[in-house]
């Protein structure tokens, strides 16, 4: 039986209850078979093009880098059906679930974007859907909760722990342990137990593949850097995957610095965590001196995650990718700059990557550079959060 690598360097693996190993083995084999099946690939591509709206545009920012020699492009995953990059890999995994004869889908969600993407794929493909979501996230993302319910999903609130994404992940895994014979756990990011990080990367890699073709057509060369926000890391690994072998292209991931990296309110495990076991994988993890998981924090629910995907950990450890961080305030500023400057309202998650790119452009205005930001999602879900913050600050 063909096998995929379970590790990226020292990171990854499959740290799960023994009861789940057969389900993960079945998933790995189904994925390997599907990747070799022309009909499966054709069906996936058809859904991406005719239902989700691929390829997505690559948009040159006309106004954001005025006064500098930077050319800044946005890869417009915000234009995808469902509002974010999540739709790509969800369609792939839902097709895999059908291929394995599963009738139900379990998912976890933070910002609600993965939940919405899962709900729409299940509605389209006739699968029953239940989504675990932290009670705190349900409060801050009520429009997405109703979207999921409109499309027939059952949204299950999780009150344990910090009542956020990590707790929803734990509940979803617990459910799957009891129901894996009939249900597929549709994990929402490039993290978790093997083979999920690899499956999610492969079902997101068209982001970077399209970007490469589009930038070559527009500029006649590859970008100097591609920049993406990193929570679990799926939009970033989707952008990075096709550029890893292009040694002259910098890969820059941006973690949430929250209220400041020097505070205890951030979500930057790559730079400020220690290796641990969490969510079925070995990866950098925010933990205290006793090894207890520390709460992550970000204004953006989708980046509020105390660990990170194992391939990012590996790329960081070998120096192939670099990882910076951006605070809530910097992300909020970038959110407003893009809205006012280009007429595009980005997700708060994506605003972290944009903020980093703008810092690169304006800190060296004389440097000629070609940058691509993965605009991983649109900001409709965040307008009430931003409104409340700006009102509190007296800015509106």
Swiss-Prot record:
Its EC number is 4.2.1.20. GO terms for molecular function: tryptophan synthase activity. It is an enzyme of class 4 (lyase). Signal peptide: none annotated. Pathway: Amino-acid biosynthesis; L-tryptophan biosynthesis; L-tryptophan from chorismate: step 5/5. The modification N6-(pyridoxal phosphate)lysine is found at residue 86. GO terms for cellular component: cytoplasm. HAMAP family: Trp_synth_beta. This is Tryptophan synthase beta chain. It comes from Aliivibrio salmonicida (strain LFI1238) (Vibrio salmonicida (strain LFI1238)).
């Amino acid at each position: 039986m063909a096998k995929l690598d379970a590790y990226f360097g020292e990171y990854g693996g499959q740290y799960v209850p023994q009861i789940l190993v057969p389900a993960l083995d079945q998933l790995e084999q189904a994925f390997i078979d599907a990747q070799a099946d022309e009909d499966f690939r054709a069906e996936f591509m058809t859904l991406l093009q005719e239902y989700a709206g691929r390829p997505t545009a690559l948009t040159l920012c006309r106004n954001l880098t005025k006064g500098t020699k930077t050319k800044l492009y946005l890869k417009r995953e915000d234009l995808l059906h469902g509002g974010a990059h999540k739709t790509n890999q969800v369609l792939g995994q839902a097709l895999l679930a059908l291929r394995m004869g599963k009738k139900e889908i379990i998912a976890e969600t933070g910002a609600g974007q993965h939940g919405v993407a899962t709900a729409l794929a299940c509605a389209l493909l006739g699968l029953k859907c239940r989504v675990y979501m932290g009670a705190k996230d349900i409060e801050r993302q009520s429009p997405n909760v109703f979207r999921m319910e409109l499309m027939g999903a059952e949204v299950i609130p999780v009150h344990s722990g910090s009542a956020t994404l990590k707790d929803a992940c734990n509940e979803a895994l617990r459910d799957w342990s009891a129901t894996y014979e009939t249900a597929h756990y549709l994990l929402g990011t490039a993290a978790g137990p093997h083979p999920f990080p690899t499956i999610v990367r492969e079902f997101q890699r068209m982001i970077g593949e399209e970007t490469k073709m589009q930038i070559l057509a527009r500029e006649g060369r590859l970008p100097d850097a591609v920049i993406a926000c990193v929570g679990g890391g799926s939009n970033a690994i989707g952008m990075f995957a096709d550029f890893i072998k292009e040694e002259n292209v910098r890969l820059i991931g941006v973690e949430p610095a929250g209220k400041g990296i020097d505070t205890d309110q951030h979500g930057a495990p790559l730079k400020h965590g220690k290796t641990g076991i969490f969510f079925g994988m070995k990866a950098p993890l925010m933990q205290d001196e006793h090894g207890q998981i520390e709460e992550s924090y970000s204004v953006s629910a989708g980046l509020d995650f105390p660990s990170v995907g194992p391939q990012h950990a590996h790329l960081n450890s070998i120096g192939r990718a670099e990882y910076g961080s951006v605070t809530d305030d910097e992300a909020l500023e970038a959110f407003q700059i893009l809205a006012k400057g280009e007429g595009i309202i980005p997700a708060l998650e994506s605003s972290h990557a944009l903020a980093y790119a703008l810092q690169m452009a304006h800190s060296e205005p004389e440097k000629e550079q070609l940058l691509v930001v993965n605009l991983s999602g649109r900001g409709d879900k965040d307008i009430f959060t931003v409104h409340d913050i700006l009102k509190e600050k007296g800015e509106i």
